[in-house]
């Protein structure tokens, strides 16, 4: 019995390497800086309307709603990281009034390829004129909110990312766009 205890296998727990890459938090941007859009309207850096978290990106306006148009971000991942290492994308989102809270749902675009995350901004956790902080979109699950990243995109280290509410009349704020990675330990 004593010898059996000596030759028992040692279980080494799996400890994945986890981390995050901040895509955009807008704090280093000048007020009024414009980001490109996938279609019409505009995306401009403004102060957080609640005055609590510095700067945020205002997508659409009262007079020029974002109609199925989303802000675009040029992403260059840190050295050694590729898109397939990332398990999710988190965003802070604040819908103005109810502009785009329902619509056709939340969307993510990678190099122009559209992914439907399976829910609209309301079911994603947004309420009018209130921040929904740290909302998670999975990059490796078809369960909403999420999608399966295609194999051919997993090796990307630079790409164009767009994210937002697909609606004929959207207006919202985005902040703290962050991607989280997880690698085998």
Role assignments for model-derived ranges:
Residues 44-69:
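Short carbohydrate-recognition loop motifs
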Residues 28, 90-99:
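Solvent-exposed strand-to-loop "edge" motifs in beta-rich extracellular domains
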């Amino acid at each position: 019995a004593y010898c059996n205890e000596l030759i028992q296998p040692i279980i080494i727990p799996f400890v994945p390497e986890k981390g995050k890459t901040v895509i955009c938090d807008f704090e280093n941007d000048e007020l009024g800086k414009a980001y490109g859009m996938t279609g019409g309207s505009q995306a401009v850096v403004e102060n957080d309307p609640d005055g609590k978290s510095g700067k945020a990106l205002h997508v659409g306006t009262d007079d020029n709603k974002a109609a199925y148009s989303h802000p675009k971000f040029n992403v260059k991942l840190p050295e050694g990281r590729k898109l397939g290492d990332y398990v999710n994308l988190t965003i802070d989102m604040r819908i103005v009034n109810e502009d785009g809270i329902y619509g056709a749902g939340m969307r993510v675009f990678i190099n122009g390829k559209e992914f439907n995350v399976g829910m609209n901004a309301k079911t994603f956790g947004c309420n009018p004129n209130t921040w929904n902080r740290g909302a998670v979109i999975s990059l490796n699950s078809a369960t909403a909110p999420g999608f399966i990243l295609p194999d051919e995109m997993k090796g990307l280290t630079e790409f164009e990312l767009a994210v937002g509410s697909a609606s004929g009349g959207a207006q919202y704020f985005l902040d703290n766009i962050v991607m989280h990675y997880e690698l085998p330990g």
